[in-house]
């Protein structure tokens, strides 16, 4: 089959928030870019998230003490951690390295790196969306964490102390304070925490679609195709992408395909442990309740967020790979909790979604040039923070590619960093 000629300077594989952001920042620097994805831009993992620009999400899932808690959590259907047991043998090597990073020293280093990429998330989103229709979907807001009582909050003191060390501001709310803040939260939680300086996206899928439209309107191109392989010349430069629509010629490539990056990365000789932390959401359409700010249900680890015309309840963690069907238990947990907390909730219909968060063993993304091939860059592995960190990751990648801001220390996001490859 004859190769299709692409005249763009750079091809970006993956059109979620990271890929679209990378394409936009490259385009704004005068580079011609083609985005490639098997799906429509922003329609996969970037679509179904909770819509939070979470500057304070600097705590990884594995923290001190979790190793003792995991068995009980997995065996309790009312806890927020799930596992497709058939996948356990395949996941054991990942879990071993993943849980090794739950010690306090590792968590502190990881939180430092997460803080760097998240502290200005709202500003980064405002900057990339400025002058586009996407900016209409961004709002600065608080983020509320609801607890059954103050003791439950104090049991989370490790995480809150670490957030405070990174400069994140929050205030406590009593039951009465919470009722004054939002009447819909009256008598729902015995204690709460209000985090300031966060942001929300009222419709993540449409938001990313609008960013993509601005990219296309300024000359960017999009190819709907599934990339199967990358072919190189004798000098380790990419020359073709092998896709289900034929071979596409190329000179420079950026790999930003989320959890689906793993297969192509292996072909590049990049041995980064990567798996899917599957997330779930239930949406209640045309609800009779609208919340002032998103609320984290702390004991169930999901967020309720009033979006445009619907209430999205999103979160949880399931380790189950990318090929297994969705599970019913996560949906049931969300529904049961919502029915218990808000029996007055009325709605027209419910919809269900499951997506794949790409997670590395140290909970940090890879933002780097390929260590083995020229003119190939990597940007994936953002676990729960993909939406929040997408624009900044795209800006960093564009600067690496164009040799700008070379004094930036990106060793913590290296494809060959200590603690990731063993």
Where are each of the predicted segments found?
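C-terminal catalytic lobe of FAD-dependent flavoproteins
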Residues: 204, 299, 340-422
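N-terminal Rossmann-like FAD-binding beta1-loop-alpha1 element of flavoenzymes
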Residues: 8-35
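Rossmann-like flavin
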Residues: 92-213
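A conserved short coil-to-beta-strand element within the FAD-binding core of flavoproteins
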Residues: 173-181, 223-238
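Active-site substrate-recognition segment that forms the wall
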Residues: 51-52, 57-101, 229-232, 237-238, ...
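Glycine-rich FAD pyrophosphate-binding loop
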Residues: 28-48
């Amino acid at each position: 089959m004859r190769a299709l000629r692409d005249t763009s300077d750079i091809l970006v594989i993956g059109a979620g928030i990271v890929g679209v952001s990378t394409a936009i920042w490259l385009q704004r620097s005068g580079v011609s870019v083609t985005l490639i994805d098997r799906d429509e831009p922003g329609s996969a993992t970037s679509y179904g998230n909770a819509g939070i620009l979470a500057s304070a999400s600097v705590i990884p899932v594995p923290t001190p003490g979790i190793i003792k808690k995991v068995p009980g959590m997995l065996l309790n259907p009312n806890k927020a951690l799930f596992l497709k047991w058939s996948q356990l043998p395949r996941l054991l090597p990942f879990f071993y390295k993943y849980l090794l990073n739950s010690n306090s020293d590792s968590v502190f280093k990881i939180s430092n790196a997460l803080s760097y990429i998240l502290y200005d998330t709202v500003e980064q989103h405002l900057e990339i969306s400025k002058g586009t229709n996407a900016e209409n979907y961004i709002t600065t807001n608080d983020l509320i964490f609801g607890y059954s009582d103050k003791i439950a909050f104090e049991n989370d003191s490790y995480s809150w102390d670490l957030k405070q060390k990174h400069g994140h501001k929050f205030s406590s709310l009593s039951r009465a304070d919470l009722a004054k803040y939002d009447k819909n939260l009256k008598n729902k939680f015995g204690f709460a925490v209000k985090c300031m300086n966060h942001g929300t996206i009222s419709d993540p899928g449409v938001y990313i679609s609008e960013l993509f439209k601005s990219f296309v309107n300024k000359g960017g191109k999009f190819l709907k195709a599934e990339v199967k392989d990358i072919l190189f010349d004798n000098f380790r430069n990419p020359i073709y992408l092998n896709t289900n629509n034929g071979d596409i010629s190329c000179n420079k490539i950026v790999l930003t395909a989320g959890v689906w990056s793993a297969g192509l990365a292996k072909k590049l000789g990049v041995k980064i442990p990567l798996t899917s932390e599957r997330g779930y959401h239930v949406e209640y359409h045309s609800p009779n309740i609208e919340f002032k700010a998103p609320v984290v249900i702390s004991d169930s680890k999901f967020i309720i967020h009033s979006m445009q015309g619907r209430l999205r309840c999103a979160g949880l963690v399931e380790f189950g790979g990318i090929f297994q069907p969705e599970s019913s238990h996560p949906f049931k947990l969300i529904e049961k909790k919502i029915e218990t907390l808000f029996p007055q909730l009325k709605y027209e219909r419910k919809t269900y979604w499951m997506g794949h968060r790409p997670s590395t063993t140290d909970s940090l993304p890879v933002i780097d040039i390929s260590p083995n091939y020229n003119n190939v860059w990597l940007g994936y592995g953002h676990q729960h923070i993909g939406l929040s960190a997408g624009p900044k990751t795209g800006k960093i990648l564009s600067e690496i590619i164009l040799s700008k801001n070379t004094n930036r220390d990106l060793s913590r996001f290296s494809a060959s960093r200590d603690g990731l490859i063993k």
